Amino acid sequence: TNIACGTARLGLKSAVITGVGEEHMGRFIREQLQREGVNTDGVKTDPDRLTALVLLGIRDQEQFPLIFYRENCADMGLTVEDIDPEFIRRARAVVATGTHLSHPQVEAATIKALELARANGQQTALDIDYRPNLWGVAGHGDGESRFVESDAVTAKLQSTLHLFDLIVGTEEEFHIAGGSTDTIEALRAVRTVSKATLVCKRGAAGAAAFTGDVPDSLDDGEAGPGFPIEVFNVLGAGDGFMSGLLKGWLEGEDWPTALKYANACGAFAVSRHGCTPAYPRWEELQFFFERGITRPDLRNDAELEQVHWATNRAGNWSSVRTFAFDHRLQLEEMEGYTLEKGGAFKELCLEAALKVQNGQ
């Protein structure tokens, strides 16, 4: 959902295939997606499962513990029957997350969507997004963990990598996909099973793209400029990065430009609090590129924040009309005032307001 919202903010037409519960959290997610301009035709309401949830903790500037509530959740309940070929046909690209390859049922749905896309000649992308505890190789208390070796996870990922035109991950995520803790070896292992462009995220060092053979150094890949900002909260940075990358990739930009978009969107995410709420719209991103960084803590950049909130207001509120009839001392000072008369007056005000609201 973060990527769907992030790409929509950047001007792409996005949709999401997922599941939510038949409860307030599920309704909130559906409504918020719609507010962001995301097509929700593929969002399934599951009456038997709850919407997935994650709790974020902020321990200090470097540690952000997570607790995932995702066992038998609504989005993991997707089946092949939930994948509509016509809905897939309308897309320009299909983006999958590695977590949805971790369970046979939702994996089958994901593979169906990818195979339909490839049969249609559409682009496909994978965000490896490796969470060891969601693959069952780490405990519930290890939500912050980003890497645990697992031959089974590596084999599962490698069995699907041929389905993608673009594969994106951190060094640790390519370690699990490639089956090696040496990043170059891991990338080369991925290359043996996939012709996809490989984009390796390197944190503060930016990212590198490899369209062909993997060289001896990550520094020899295609790169875009990085942005030196203060890290405030890393949650959602990967989805922000992916949103910017997809904007450039799908609109035919070269890799340095696409990576520039990606690095900037990731920088916005880590220097603000939250995921989707931190992501920029296209106008804000252009303003950021033209003006540059004036302070590393972007959330405290008043000029940038003004652009952010001005371009992310929900709704088109041309005017607000307020009718206040709460108590005022001036009422008590009127000749002949009593509490009973004051109460009756307020009831008349309420009745009039309700009639106006109902168009009477």
Task: Show which residues each predicted segment covers.
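Short, conserved phosphate/pyrophosphate- and ester-handling motifs at nucleotide-, phospho-/glycolipid
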Residues: 7, 170, 238
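Conserved N-terminal subdomain of the carbohydrate kinase-like
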Residues: 13-98, 286-295
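Hydrophobic anchor at the start of a short beta-strand
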Residues: 13-14, 40, 122-124, 198, ...
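Alpha-helix C-terminal capping segments
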Residues: 2-13, 56-58, 248-250
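Alpha/beta catalytic barrel-like cores
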Residues: 295-360
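Conserved beta-alpha-beta core of the PfkB/ribokinase-like small-molecule kinase fold
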Residues: 93-189, 196, 200, 204-213
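Conserved phosphate-binding/catalytic region of the ribokinase-like
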Residues: 115-119, 179-303
